[in-house]
């Protein structure tokens, strides 16, 4: 397996990087970025100053170099061998804007926390956004995966999405062009979302506040929100609840190394100490196999897994055991 070498990649970009205003970091530790606090190095991390800076940088990066965008790292599992190519981490200064965009409309930057969108909607009496108060992560991730909770989801509120493609060209996508499905967007995978326009409706602030309080109380009661976790580990299969399938297969509280399926909510995987990316993914694949053996249902990952395995620590998908 090729090891990451950020300095070499940075030098290959040439003199054009002198025009970049954002931060470029070779061999950046991803365990400082993700909520799991695990994983290897990013070969090169770029934090753009704004959208113009992002487009300028992307035009410098050769087409064969992979590019991965991360938000706040809430739904991301990085493997221990690191991430080859460029990791783009959007900054709050350039991509965290949150402002009114017309009657019952809000413009939100991709790195804006989901709960902040809910809070602004409350401040202005705009209904339809309460569910974001219970979703960890940022708007960019919500746009990509059609995030939802408590009977609400992103596709019901989004009007248009602004993005930059791998070549640095800008695009504006309508809701239909986003191709939304359950926890899925059909938008091109190379698109980097920069901001979006959302639309709600007039609603009494007291009603919105009550709905948000109910979401908060539910999360605090049934989810391990103070642990190092990436949120829901697996999608709910049609007609089933993932947590119930995991529980019935005897996997509540299961541990591999320092990785554990939370005893509080067994569809939440947590890092109880210094878990490696290998331990976390190995645990997840073991749970998938046990659920299949018990119920015949195949769980699909909701958490995004990226990067390379360390040599000798490869994991076969859906077998839950190392191939080494």
From Swiss-Prot:
GO terms for cellular component: cytosol. Gene3D superfamilies: 3.30.465.10, UDP-N-acetylenolpyruvoylglucosamine reductase, C-terminal domain, Uridine Diphospho-n-acetylenolpyruvylglucosamine Reductase, domain 2. Its cofactor is FAD. Pathway: Cell wall biogenesis; peptidoglycan biosynthesis. The active site is at residues 183, 232, 302. Its EC number is 1.3.1.98. Disulfide bonds: none annotated. This is UDP-N-acetylenolpyruvoylglucosamine reductase. The gene is murB.
